[in-house]
From Swiss-Prot:
Catalyzes the formation of the alpha-1,6-glucosidic linkages in glycogen by scission of a 1,4-alpha-linked oligosaccharide from growing alpha-1,4-glucan chains and the subsequent attachment of the oligosaccharide to the alpha-1,6 position. The active site is at D405, E458. GO terms for cellular component: cytosol. The lineage of its organism: Bacteria, Pseudomonadati, Pseudomonadota, Gammaproteobacteria, Enterobacterales. PANTHER family: 1,4-ALPHA-GLUCAN-BRANCHING ENZYME (PTHR43651:SF3). This is 1,4-alpha-glucan branching enzyme GlgB. GO terms for molecular function: 1,4-alpha-glucan branching enzyme activity; cation binding; hydrolase activity, hydrolyzing O-glycosyl compounds. It comes from Klebsiella pneumoniae subsp. pneumoniae (strain ATCC 700721 / MGH 78578). Belongs to the glycosyl hydrolase 13 family. GlgB subfamily.
């Protein structure tokens, strides 16, 4: 019997409470020779085998009936490669001993991970297929600095935490182990004895695939190959490009009619992608696809940041969907949630028994609106985890843009909190300085590492410089959702037209701050839930007026400076609020031609016309690209403005937000000539009253509104028209 192993150590190993298994298990030099020790629960016979010859070189004695074996090889002085022939239940198995392999993490990786500057931590942490000393298997690593013991458990070891306790790298707080024979497709988790002695079983924070809820195990799989972003997709994200975004929740865009089940990623590739292309959108924005346990969160409470949800298929199926979108000429935007995470016990919450990823003080670490936990951005390993995740989706899946959710909740410590419910920053202010630095750092790194990919901020306050460079005090985003514009214009549109004259400024106010940020004009999922009604149902009047108002508003939206976003269903005027548990109301487009078809055709024409004319998108963020022609006609609720491209070509946009046609409506123009009606939301093609100007109107040498030439138009009721100057 070995004289080197204390009985207390054996007991601790078997009980799963020993933190340094490599100091005991494996091959060790002793005065008597090489000693091999193994913990093999339920084994009855163990031999040391020399792989080259298959010869038995020593038998291990059972020192504890619970599975601890040890044996001395007296003729051996130098460590050698060996295997173990283990008999379980009468059957012998030849295995490689995980405890004969050295440390896995390289010194540089350890240093970078500890410093929080490892750009791609997912290449090191988590589960990765590997071949070590000719043995194939999987190397596992997890950050849990305060755990007393960590084991990897899974289908390869009967989920038994005694079998594979991991090596602790004290300098980094990372636990690691190479498990021979563990292979792709197998399920696994990490079993921890936490800082307080409690047993916890956690999913891998870096898992590339996970089980679908309610199960929560991680899956071993290869790191996806890198995806390059070609020049055409980079160009499609630029400030002067036409950007029209179709925002989609994959689980409810369309469902199987027989069982209300989701479409798969591949079915969505075959149905959603060609539809979005046919409609003329340039970008698909996906509500979060990260793995999440609660359907009702719409993906905004993720537990698997690195894993596409299994609801719709495998990770490779998701890549197929992304590739299909790119092949159709659509860029893909992913909603990204670095602001908070749910408190589910299997995920990040109290990961090692301490507040590892979150703040310990609920005044900093608990989000009371959503019952979620807030990341501790000041902890380098946490910010590194998130920055690496942003790079992962762009580099490994070809995602073209990230839309960052709930930025305001990240950058303000008092967000949705009363006095006494939050802690000021070190200067006594309300700003979350660590979150601000995290966002700046993320945007800077993405700009350096993935040029052409962009980020968009959903930021609901007037924080200055969201889309300005960090060097100038900004956050470094490329685009910001203009929620103020959205609220103002919807507030205006819901009014009875007779009252709109008193709220004229709601439609013009956006231009007073238009050039402070690079704006996206969003009619998003948030505007069609929680009792807000659908966009159509917010419009006043009878059915005809509701549809006319909506069409006029869409005409205004697509002409106004800023990139465009419509949530699914808005493009055909769905009448009810969005419900994530069922399909959109596609039946509204069945049967004979109707008002919903009209709105759908209008949105398609708006998209294609918007993309065709540079004046409508080239100078969204340059004052030269916009000019009011009529801004003060509040009595008739009429607005007229010009959009302009770099070459000086103009498009005139005129909106009449009353049900009264305005005949002979004269206004001054900059460029005399013949103007063609490129789009009229009142056209019979869209189920309007078909009033207009016969397609073409000539300017007159009659002064108006301070200009020498003017146009006299018929402005249809509740309508927007676009006029394009024909070449002379």
């Amino acid at each position: 019997m070995s004289n080197h192993i204390d009985r207390d150590v054996i007991n601790a190993l078997i009980a799963g409470h020993f933190a340094d298994p490599f100091s005991v298990l494996g091959m060790h030099r002793t005065d008597a020779g090489l000693e091999v020790r193994a913990l093999l629960p339920d084994a009855t016979d163990v031999w040391v085998i020399e792989p080259k010859t298959g010869r038995k070189v020593g038998k291990l004695e059972c020192l504890d009936s619970r599975g601890f074996f040890s044996g001395v090889l007296p003729r051996r002085k130098n460590a050698f490669r060996y295997q173990l022939a283990v008999t379980w239940h009468g059957q012998q198995n030849l295995i490689d001993d995980p405890y004969r392999f050295g440390p896995l993490l390289q010194d540089l990786d350890v240093w970078l991970l500890s410093e929080g500057t490892h750009l791609r931590p997912y290449e090191t942490l988590g589960a990765h297929a590997a071949t070590m000393d000719g043995v194939t298997g999987t190397r596992f690593s997890v950050w849990a600095p305060n755990a007393r013991r960590v084991s990897v458990v899974g289908q390869f070891n009967y989920w038994d935490g005694r079998r594979h306790p991991m090596r602790f790298r004290k300098e980094s707080g990372i636990w690691e182990l190479f498990v021979p024979g563990a292979h792709n497709g197998q399920l696994y988790k990490f079993e921890l004895i936490d800082a307080h002695g409690n047993l916890r079983v956690k999913a891998d924070p870096y898992a590339f695939e996970s089980q679908m809820r309610p199960e929560s195990a991680s899956l071993i799989c290869d790191l996806p190959p890198k995806v390059e972003q070609p020049a055409d997709r980079r160009a499609a994200n630029q400030f002067d490009a036409p950007i029209s975004i179709y925002e989609v929740h994959l689980g409810s865009w369309r469902r199987h009619t027989d069982n209300n089940f989701w479409l798969s990623y591949r079915e969505l590739a075959d149905q959603l992608v060609p539809y979005a292309k046919w409609m003329g959108f340039t970008h698909l924005e996906l509500l979060p696809v990260n793995e999440h346990p609660f359907d009702g969160s719409w993906g905004y409470q993720p537990t698997g940041l690195y894993a596409p949800t299994r609801r719709f298929g495998t990770r490779d199926d998701f890549r197929y969907f992304i590739n299909a979108a790119h092949a159709a000429g659509l860029n893909v935007i992913l909603d990204w949630v670095p602001g908070h995470f749910p408190a589910d016990d299997f995920a990040l919450a109290s990961f090692d028994g301490t507040s590892l990823y979150e703040h310990s003080d609920p005044r900093e670490g608990y989000h009371q609106d959503w019952n979620t936990l807030i990341y501790n951005y000041g902890r380098r390993e946490v910010s590194n985890y998130l920055v690496g995740n942003a790079l992962y989706w762009i580099e490994r899946f070809g995602i073209d843009a990230l839309r960052v959710d709930a930025v305001a909740s990240m950058i303000y410590r008092d967000y949705s909190r009363k006095a006494g419910e939050w802690i000021p920053n070190e200067y006594g202010g309300r700003e979350n300085l660590e979150a601000i630095e995290f966002l700046r750092n993320t945007n800077r790194i993405l700009g350096e590492q993935t040029p052409g990919a962009v980020t968009m901020a959903e930021e609901s306050t007037d924080f200055a410089g969201v889309t300005r460079p960090p060097a100038g005090g900004g956050l470094g985003f490329w685009f910001k959702w203009n929620l103020g514009w959205m609220h103002d214009t919807l507030d205006y549109m819901k009014l009875d037209p007779v009252h709109r004259r008193y709220h004229h400024d709601k439609m013009t106010f956006g231009m007073l701050y238009n050039y402070t940020e690079n704006f996206v004009l969003p009619l998003s999922h948030d505007e069609v839930v929680h009792g807000k009604k659908s966009i159509l149902d917010r419009m006043p009047g009878d059915a005809w007026q509701k549809f006319a108002n909506l069409r006029a508003y869409y005409g205004w939206l697509f002409a106004f400076p800023g990139k465009k976003l419509l949530f699914m269903g808005n493009e055909f005027a769905q009448g009810r609020e969005w419900n994530h548990d069922v399909s959109l109301d596609w039946h509204l487009l069945e049967g004979g031609d109707n008002w919903h078809h009209g709105v759908q055709r209008l949105v398609r024409d708006l998209n294609h016309t918007y993309r065709h004319h540079k004046a409508l998108h080239e100078l969204d963020f340059d004052p030269y690209g916009f000019e009011w022609l009529v801004v003060d006609d509040h009595e008739r609720s009429v607005f007229v403005f010009v959009r302009r491209d770099r070459a000086g070509n103009e498009i005139i946009v005129a909106s009449n937000f009353t049900p009264v046609p305005r005949h002979d409506y004269r206004f001054g123009i900059n460029q005399p000539g013949r103007w063609r009606e490129a789009l009229n939301t009142d056209s019979m093609h869209y189920h309007g009253s078909n009033q207009g100007n016969g397609g073409v109107v000539e300017s007159d040498a009659i002064a108006s509104h301070g200009r020498e030439h003017s146009l006299s138009l018929t402005l249809p009721p509740l309508a927007t028209i676009w006029l394009v100057r024909e070449a002379q």
